[in-house]
């Protein structure tokens, strides 16, 4: 069995642990001399290990897609699918989000509200990765097979370059009301920058990579991972900007990002495939091109 790891323990775990410790050591002024307290603490530790390693989700089984999820026609240019909408002509997808973080270190631009990646995501949404993935399939979005992770030699130095098939290019836009009350639409990449170089993620820098399924677990659904600024194979979408393989570089631009809980609409827009230089080209069957 392949474990589906969570990179950090879930936030709810820390809340439970804090309440437990307050009850044991503050309210009751007790110590671990009491055998019952030892049992309680042992249970907390076991749950901690399970949740942080992925065992918790293994016990629960794979996250299931929403039942009876069918597109409903609103007009010639809009269909509803669960909590999202899409345009069959432009193949654009849009859904409601809210500002979840506007100051802290980020690994994701968008996550759903139900999973463990929420504390490191710029935006959150009630729309699930399943809903988005189904809409993308209906609209014939083709995921890229470009390589997400670098290979390293024994000394830790990267080997070669990431290979790319040129597919899956997309833009992620945010639409919201500005301070003057007027509607603004701009790339979500304008809200996040590399703290060292000060360069923003920018426009048109996203790739639909489609997540992975391991032992029946759709990783995007297990983690709620929709769009990652720190590359992750479980995310539906990734950016490949310089530094996107480093989880300590990406922060919101506080002067750009609206206040916490501000409601925004996220728009996924497909872009044309791009031509990739031969040195970086990944041929369609997933093998690396050789001369």
Cite the ranges covered by each PLM segment.
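Bacterial N-terminal signal peptides that target proteins for export
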Residues: 21, 30-43
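Extreme N-terminal basic, low-complexity initiation segments
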Residues: 2-8
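Boundary at the C-terminal end of the N-terminal hydrophobic targeting segment
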Residues: 55-59
